[in-house]
């Protein structure tokens, strides 16, 4: 169940991270759904039998996966590709792997294209607005990581039971499956992907 919460949350973050301009409605749909997931997840953590909270999370799952929030915007699925290599090599559940990779991906984006990540940080986690978008984005990534940890999710390779991840092996497979570049929000090279894996250690 916690893995599914991670997966749903990461699906919404993926749809939220776009360079497409003038998508305020779908921005708000993504961010509102993320806010609801977080609120209801905390309720379920405190009250595991809370039917209404669980029902709202299931509704969020439907919204996250039915494409509504991605209408009219270019999405970025690079974090999924990065995670697929973890699942393939180490037999890790997809949601667990995303809980590890996505905050690392966000931290990388904070340096290279912070605008949408900073917006996410402000609108979802109430990070104060600042002219330093990188700082805002890093704070948002840290808050998401804290949320995942509070929910009992792994947030690093060691917490997946992977003491020494074979990053070279993952990159060889990633290049074979996706080519030299992947993603849309920032086009990632294999060097960039190595850094994201490193940030997830």
Where are these regions (language model features)?
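Single conserved hydrophobic/aromatic residue that forms the stacking wall/gate
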Residues: 1-14
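Alpha-helical hydrophobic/aromatic positions enriched in membrane-embedded helices and signal peptides
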Residues: 1-3, 72, 86, 181
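Active-site segments that bind and position negatively charged phosphate/pyrophosphate groups
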Residues: 18-143
């Amino acid at each position: 169940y916690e893995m599914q919460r991670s997966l749903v949350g990461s699906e919404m973050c993926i749809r939220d991270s776009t360079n497409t301009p003038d998508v305020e409605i779908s921005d708000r749909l993504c961010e509102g759904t993320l806010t609801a997931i977080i609120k209801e997840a905390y309720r379920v953590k405190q009250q595991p039998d809370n039917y209404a909270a669980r029902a709202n999370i299931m509704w969020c799952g439907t919204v996250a996966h039915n494409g509504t929030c991605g209408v009219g915007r270019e999405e970025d699925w690079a974090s999924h590709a990065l995670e697929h290599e973890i699942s393939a090599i180490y037999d890790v559940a997809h949601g667990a792997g995303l809980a590890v990779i996505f905050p690392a991906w966000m931290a990388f984006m904070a340096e290279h294209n912070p605008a949408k990540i900073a917006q996410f940080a402000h609108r979802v986690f109430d990070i104060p607005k600042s002219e330093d978008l990188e700082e805002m984005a890093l704070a948002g990534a840290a808050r998401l990581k804290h949320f995942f940890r509070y929910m009992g999710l792994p947030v690093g390779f060691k917490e997946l039971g992977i003491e020494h991840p074979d990053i070279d092996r993952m990159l060889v497979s990633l290049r074979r499956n996706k080519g030299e570049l992947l993603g849309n929000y920032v086009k990632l090279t294999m060097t960039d992907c190595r850094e994201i894996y490193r940030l997830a250690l």
